[in-house]
């Protein structure tokens, strides 16, 4: 399991919440106190919840589940993309389009259009059009890549969503709840933990904190993928063996 220490959380500023006047009373159980009108999050509450969330992501990945990373604030766009790509998961890091999940059929059409334009660009078919038409298509492609590029290989709805700043991404949370998709979410002191399946009480503005969350999630997912057994591949190995070899291998396994 991903191992993060209290010291790492402190160094990343996970404990710094928002100004006390903006607090959400439902976050009271996770608040240690206040300093200079800034709420301080109780990391003794955060750390075990964080570990539970990472363990859950690891288990989902071990079962070949799809985990959608969501973080569209400018400060976190780069790290969301980097870490989602590192663990081979889809991501949304620019703008959450309305109906991205609840109207996934339409989103899939946009993904198909993006791939068509990419193919036309790569094989030279765009050169058959006038410069004006080709420029228009390239602009369309840029917009599509920005909006759906991170979910280009997501052929079905995700099994879980990993969201940093559930308040800012309230539309994503809402769609997940409508569809019954579990949410692992970083919730700061100004937002509500209600409706979040795995709450991570923590700073959602500090880039170091965001890096800690995203890197830990990606690492947990990679560990889960590595631990997952590909039963199909195992079955294929036995099918391809000669009868006497299969018997020997089976006997060796049982004996070992």
From Swiss-Prot:
One of its GO terms (biological process) is translation. GO terms for cellular component: cytosolic small ribosomal subunit. Gene3D superfamilies: Glucose-6-phosphate isomerase like protein, domain 1 (3.40.50.10490), Helix hairpin bin (1.10.287.610). Disulfide bonds: none annotated. InterPro entries: Ribosomal_uS2, Ribosomal_uS2_bac/mit/plastid, Ribosomal_uS2_CS, Ribosomal_uS2_flav_dom_sf. SUPFAM superfamilies: Ribosomal protein S2. GO terms for molecular function: structural constituent of ribosome. Keywords: Ribonucleoprotein, Ribosomal protein. NCBIfam families: rpsB_bact. Belongs to the universal ribosomal protein uS2 family. PANTHER family: 30S RIBOSOMAL PROTEIN S2 PROKARYOTIC AND ORGANELLAR, SMALL RIBOSOMAL SUBUNIT PROTEIN US2M. This is Small ribosomal subunit protein uS2. It comes from Methylococcus capsulatus (strain ATCC 33009 / NCIMB 11132 / Bath). The gene is rpsB.
């Amino acid at each position: 399991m991903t191992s993060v220490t209290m010291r790492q959380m402190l160094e990343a500023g996970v404990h710094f919440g928002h100004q006390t006047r903006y607090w959400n009373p439902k976050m009271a159980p996770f608040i240690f106190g206040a300093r200079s009108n800034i709420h301080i999050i109780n990391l003794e509450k955060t750390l075990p919840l964080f570990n539970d969330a990472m363990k859950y992501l690891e288990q989902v990945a071990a079962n070949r589940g799809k985990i959608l990373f969501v973080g569209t604030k400018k400060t976190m766009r780069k790290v969301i993309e980097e870490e989602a790509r590192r663990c081979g998961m889809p991501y949304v890091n620019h703008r959450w389009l309305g109906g991205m999940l609840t109207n996934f059929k339409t989103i899939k059409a946009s993904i198909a259009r993006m791939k068509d334009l990419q193919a036309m660009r790569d094989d030279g078919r765009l050169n058959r059009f006038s410069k004006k038409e080709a420029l228009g298509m390239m602009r369309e492609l840029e917009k599509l890549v920005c909006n759906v590029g991170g979910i280009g290989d997501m052929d079905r709805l995700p099994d879980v969503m990993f969201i940093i700043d559930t308040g800012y991404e309230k539309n994503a949370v809402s769609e997940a709840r409508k569809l019954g998709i579990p949410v692992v979410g970083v919730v700061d002191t100004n937002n509500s933990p209600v409706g979040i399946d795995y709450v991570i009480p923590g700073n959602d503005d500090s880039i170091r904190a965001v890096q800690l969350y995203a890197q830990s999630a990606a690492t947990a997912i990679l560990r889960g993928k590595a631990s997952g057994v590909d039963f199909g591949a195992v079955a294929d190995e036995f099918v391809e063996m000669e009868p006497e070899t299969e018997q020997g291998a089976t006997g060796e396994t049982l004996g070992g």
